[in-house]
Amino acid sequence: MATVPTRSGSPRQLTTKQTGDAWEAQARRWLEGKGLRFIAANVNERGGEIDLIMREGRTTVFIEVRYRRSALYGGAAASVTRSKQHKLLQTARLWLARHNGSFDTVDCRFDVVAFTGNEVEWIKDAFNDHS
């Protein structure tokens, strides 16, 4: 877990949520620098969550952000399991339906932004509903 200095000068541990939020904010800024436009963050639908929803041209991009300190156990990208992919697909399906869309009517893709140590990897179209 990351640490941050406090007013007293002694560092305190960030919660897992705070650490995740910080990496998601960094991913958002990085992707905006690449030309994507922000739509929403931390979208919850029936037990699933999508970290970021952005737009690249006419494509709606659902983004999973992952961070790992090292690649010792496969790195950040490897942590997006089939089970997690299924949950992201279901959450996106529900979000699209709530916005009068579907995978059939909206051009969309699923990306992963993986931070492993100081390295960033952007995996466009990492998986889809046909995977």
Swiss-Prot record:
Question: Which superkingdom does the taxonomy of this entry point to?
Answer: Bacteria
Database matches in HAMAP family? UPF0102
GO molecular-function terms, A-Z: nucleic acid binding
Q: Which NCBIfam families match?
A: PRK12497.1-3, YraN family protein
Region annotated Disordered, chain positions: 1-21
Protein family membership: Belongs to the UPF0102 family.
User: CDD domains, from UniProt?
Assistant: PoNe_Nuclease
Pfam families with a match to the protein in the record: UPF0102
Q: Where is the composition biased (Polar residues)?
A: 1-19
Its protein name is: UPF0102 protein YraN
